[in-house]
Amino acid sequence: MDGDIEHLLFIYALQNAVKHDSAPKSGTVIGTVLGKHPEFRSRARELGPLAGKAVAQVGKMSAADRKSRLEALAPELLAELTETHEHVRKLPDLEGAENGVVMRFAPNPSGPLHLGHARASILNDYYVRRYGGRYVLRVEDTDPKRVDPDAYAMVLEDVEWLGLGITDIVYQSDRLDIYYDWCRKLIELGGAYVCVCDSERFRELKLKGKACPCRELTVEENLELWQQMLDGEFYEGDVTVRVKTDLAHPDPAMRDYSAMRIVNAPLHPRVDATVFPLMNFSVAVDDHLLGITHVIRGKDHIANTRRQRYIFDYFGWKPPVYRHYGRMGISGVVLSTSGMREGINSGLYTGWDDIHLGTMRAIARRGIEPEAVRNAMVDIGIGETDISFSWENLYSRNKELVDPKANRYFFVPDPVEVTVEGAPRREAHAALHPNDPSRGVRTLVAEEAILLPRADIEGKSMVRLKDLYNVKIAWDGDTPRVSYAGDSLEEARHEKAPIIQWLPADAKLPCTLLRQDGSLEGFCEPLVAGETDRVVQFERIGFARIDSADGGRVSAYFAHR
């Protein structure tokens, strides 16, 4: 097992050195290995010395030696540098990152990850790989009302699918005693107090910039109330711990915000507790204790950054370097976790991977590769300007990846069965991939009846059947009469006859192509049944992932043109 890890560390150190034409960093190499081989995450802390050894070996090699050694040991990694990475945008430098970074991705386990999560997770991962260091997956599960027990596993699965180089996994619900301790310390500093005011009364005072009576309690009185909270002597809504801020702050939401509260129901799925921190308190404590150096997140968190700075200032902690990127509008899919859950429960959606949703598992089911998502998010970058997510760019990025791999097949939607009058028996030999003859060909035999796509022949007087011959079409109302019109491709071009796909009527499989705007029913080549869980190209239609081929029926999900 150690030999496997050492080999992986060495080849990825080589790849990093060739890519950047400089000596690699241990943290970057470790992040890459853990992102591509999550089975080693449980041993993340053991990798430092092994990575150091690999980096030292590579550092002594010349640029030419590095490249030739990489080509000998892992030619596919060298190919990645020329095929894909040369097209990936380089993001701006991070201040103070020269000696490595510690960054975090902090989802709430309310459901699976979606495109919004993907942006945050990928941008942070990008910089950890670039500068080296640690990448913490921090599951922020301190609000029982927003925790879905099934989401814990879904988040880990989605993180693995995205290939994030996670080095540490932290569950905030495991750290409640830590938050309790720091809350007590904050009270002792005079930076927080226990408030038993009615919430509406407190709101009225806050809007007027006035202190509530609880703000004047002594440290001893506050500590006694805090202990009563922990002992279960209060109930939900009775009490909260507030951080002392500026009652004259121009933004009322900044004035004495809540840090701790009681939640009696629902019960937390992982811990037996009723006192939980609110996000800004637990995040500030964790960012300090976990050594987070840089935080990249949306500008909708700018106010939270200001709240968290109060905690850092009270304790004299150095805050991370913050970068806030602009909002990303995403059209065409559902992203609201509550909306998705309601739709699933009502039967509107088939599950979290329904193609109308913006979850990672829905994206994956359509045949979008994780590297395409990564590249698309890096293309968007960390700018502060609000933008709209470009599906076309994601599809373009995915096409770069799947086009060289996807075998070609015919799919005939809404078929019309015809007999071509005067046609000879003919075998069509169509390449599985036009740029890779070694894959071989598909053989389609045209004799007697064939299937043609209705939409492609309606109103046409002549078409060319791809890899076969030309046919003329005469119409008797809605009924086509089809006759053989020779083999000449030049004649078809001269007549501007469209080239369409077709199938033998006696060699086909029923196929459903599921799309966001409605399904297509038709038939595909029998060989498609062997492509389950792979992306193929249905010629003239687009790329699709073959989801299943059970009971003689193919189910496919449309990816893009």
Curated annotation (Swiss-Prot):
Disulfide connectivity?
none
Alphabetical list of InterPro entries matching this protein? aa-tRNA-synth_I_CS (IPR001412), Gln/Glu-tRNA_Ligase (IPR050132), Glu-tRNA-synth_arc/euk (IPR004526), Glu/Gln-tRNA-synth (IPR000924), Glu/Gln-tRNA-synth_Ib_cat-dom (IPR020058), Glu/Gln-tRNA-synth_Ib_codon-bd (IPR020059), Rbsml_bL25/Gln-tRNA_synth_N (IPR020056), Ribosomal_bL25/Gln-tRNA_synth (IPR011035)
Cellular compartment(s): Cytoplasm
The EC number(s) attached to this protein equal 6.1.1.17
Q: Its Gene Ontology molecular function terms? A: ATP binding; glutamate-tRNA ligase activity
Task: Please state what class of enzyme this protein is.
Answer: ligase
- Tell me the keywords, alphabetical order: Aminoacyl-tRNA synthetase, ATP-binding, Cytoplasm, Ligase, Nucleotide-binding, Protein biosynthesis
Q: What is its main location?
A: cytoplasm
Q: Where is this motif: 'HIGH' region?
A: 107-117
Superkingdom field: Archaea
Pfam families in the cross-refs: tRNA-synt_1c, tRNA-synt_1c_C, tRNA-synt_1c_C2
Question: What is one GO biological process annotated to this record?
Answer: amide biosynthetic process
Q: Which reaction(s) are listed as its catalytic activity?
A: tRNA(Glu) + L-glutamate + ATP = L-glutamyl-tRNA(Glu) + AMP + diphosphate
The yes or no answer to whether the keyword Protein biosynthesis is present is yes
Alphabetical GO CC annotations of the entry are: cytosol; protein-containing complex
For this UniProt entry, which residues form the secretion signal?
none
Q: Which NCBIfam families does its entry note?
A: gltX_arch (TIGR00463), PRK04156.1 (NF003169)
Q: What does this protein do?
A: Catalyzes the attachment of glutamate to tRNA(Glu) in a two-step reaction: glutamate is first activated by ATP to form Glu-AMP and then transferred to the acceptor end of tRNA(Glu).
Tell me its family: Belongs to the class-I aminoacyl-tRNA synthetase family. Glutamate--tRNA ligase type 2 subfamily.
The name this protein goes by in its record: Glutamate--tRNA ligase
